Amino acid sequence: MTLRRAARRAAISWIAIAISVVASIGGATALDYPTRPVRWVVGFAPGGANDIIARLIGARLSERLGQQFVIENKPGAGGNIGAESVINAEPDGYTVLLVNPSNFINTSLYANLQFNFPRDVAAVASFIRVPNVMTVGKGVEAKTAAEFIAYAKANPGKVNMASAGTGTSTHLSGEMFMAMAGIKMQHVPYRGAGPAVTDMLGGQVQVIFDSMPSIIPHIRSGALRALAVTTATRSSQLPDTPAVADTVPGYEASALFGMGAPKNTPKEIIEKLNKEINAVLAEPAVQKQLVELGGDPVIGTPEAFGTLIVSETEKWKKVIEDAGIPKVE
């Protein structure tokens, strides 16, 4: 009996030692992370807002953590190709995703997705909210959102609303505005914001809910006129322009960007990335560059960003369903 007790105690001691060693290794892994370059997937081509934001923050993370955050552009299917590649990657912290509005929208817009974004992506950190701007051409007499709503109600279906394409945030921002303001406009989708803005300048279409970086040069030049921004409050870039919510209470349709990782990425790694990203977002030089992109930093926990991912996905799902937008096969 004594030998059995001794053997049992020895076995328990070895198990305890093994658990302690594994725990210490796990802690060391998180503490030392990253020990090699991190692949940061951006689901769009180089040069756009997604790419610019990732490169800005990635450069500072590379400096702070001593390993390169290598931007890998994987465009296609509205960002779905890039998202799926990250979702299917090893959850070890060495593959991350630039999260953007298309990820929230596509969950309801695409019929045959092989993933559920809020379920299959681990939220790491939010970066920035960028407003769209409700903008009209010189031929539109309305000087405020309220005047525009009154005009649209008096002329149902006669106002043309441009967008960068069906299902984009520029389209759905307008659909939400129509639903909440009780008006009807004709949607005119374009292949990107560039040609849409060109026709705005030419007077072929009357209104667009375009992204701040794309539209603000034309507003500042006086070629187009801003009626309202789509964030819940005014933007520091257009401080004299009210929010849509000042006229349509509850309206909010900004573009949220952040970092995601494969589900089951170790919590310690996510928390370390979150801490470093928040430190980067607090740097005055980075804040200045983000403001120049038209947005304001959103500093928070992984849990807070996860909650935002769910709420944004649900918001756009309702807009898509209420507008009767057909799913992309």
Regions of interest found by a model, annotated:
Residues 23-27:
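N-terminal signal peptide c-region/cleavage motif recognized by signal peptidases
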Residues 1-8:
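N-terminal secretory signal peptides that target proteins for export/translocation
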Residues 8-18:
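Sec-dependent N-terminal signal peptides
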Residues 88-94, 109-195, 244, 249, ...:
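Hinge/capping helix and adjacent helix->loop/strand transition within the periplasmic-binding protein
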Residues 29-119, 158-160, 166, 182-211, ...:
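N-terminal (or domain-start) structured segment
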Residues 35-37, 179-181, 220, 267-329:
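An extracytoplasmic/periplasmic, membrane-proximal ligand-sensing/linker region
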Residues 195-252:
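Anionic-ligand binding region
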